């Protein structure tokens, strides 16, 4: 079924039972060896609050888990986050409302841990600009701080997100855009630097002061900056990232 489900129809793998033996060795190997990083993994935590009488304090099914040693609910839920990160999950469903309430009230640090480290967190790690009259040469390096991937290669998205540089005038209006064809965000994995060299000429009619910015644009929406990059807010102009002021 894999060639049909994943390759032809473009479905993404989803797995519940993250943080338990229900996520089997065979399935883990399939994710590691066959699916990731080409396919983003949609993860769901275990449904631990499943006591038939509603009293979850006495029903601790996780204590019988065959993979992880867990003594209480806090340990069980923390294991879910660790397992989700180790499995490169793009998402982690906290499951039913009562369980979500426990997460938020008792383990906000673990919720934040997945927000910070799970999925994709893309950012330009280094940008060097060289200007020769109307020609700009940019050396730029990108990283993914998250354990997952931006599924830009999914058939429904069809590589619509692209690395683009723009020039803004003093009114913050975009007057020039260049898209780097060699940079592909779906390839960016945690722990690796992705380096590119971009060179382009600026139209002769542009003269004066301009702001050079970079962003991940959506080619289906008039190349507007579409992805929130993991960069300090004081460098942001909307979803664009400030690079340098230029005099043309």
List PLM regions with ranges.
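Intrinsic disorder/low-complexity segments enriched in polar/charged and small flexible residues
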Residues: 24, 49-50, 105, 190, ...
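Catalytic cores of secreted or luminal carbohydrate-active enzymes
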Residues: 76-127
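Acidic, low-complexity intrinsically disordered regions
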Residues: 18, 43-44, 99, 138, ...
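Catalytic-core regions of glycoside hydrolase
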Residues: 1-98
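Short amphipathic alpha-helical surface micro-motifs
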Residues: 73-75, 103-108, 179-181, 195
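Extracellular/luminal regions of secreted and cell-surface proteins that mediate adhesion/ECM remodeling
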Residues: 112-248
């Amino acid at each position: 079924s894999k060639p049909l489900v994943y390759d032809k129809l473009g479905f993404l793998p989803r797995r519940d039972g993250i943080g338990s033996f229900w996520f089997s060795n065979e399935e883990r190997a399939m994710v590691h060896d066959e699916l990731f990083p080409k396919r983003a993994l949609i993860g769901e935590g275990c449904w631990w609050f499943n006591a038939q009488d509603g009293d979850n304090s006495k029903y601790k099914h996780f204590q019988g888990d065959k993979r992880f040693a867990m003594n209480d609910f806090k340990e069980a839920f923390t294991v879910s986050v660790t397992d989700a990160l180790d499995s490169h999950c793009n998402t982690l469903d906290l499951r039913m409302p009562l369980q979500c309430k426990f997460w938020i009230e008792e383990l906000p640090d673990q919720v934040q841990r997945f927000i910070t480290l799970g999925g994709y967190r893309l950012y330009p790690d280094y940008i060097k600009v060289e200007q020769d009259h109307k020609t700009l040469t940019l050396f730029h390096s990108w990283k993914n701080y998250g354990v997952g991937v931006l599924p830009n290669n999914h058939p429904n998205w069809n590589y619509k997100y692209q690395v683009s540089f723009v020039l803004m005038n003093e009114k913050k209006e975009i007057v020039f855009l260049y898209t780097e064809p060699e940079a592909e965000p779906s390839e960016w994995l945690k722990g690796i630097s992705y380096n590119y060299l971009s060179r382009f000429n600026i139209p002769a009619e542009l003269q004066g002061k301009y702001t050079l910015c970079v962003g991940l644009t959506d080619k289906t929406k008039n190349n507007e900056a579409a992805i929130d990059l993991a960069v300090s807010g004081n460098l942001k102009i909307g979803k664009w990232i400030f690079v340098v002021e230029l005099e043309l």
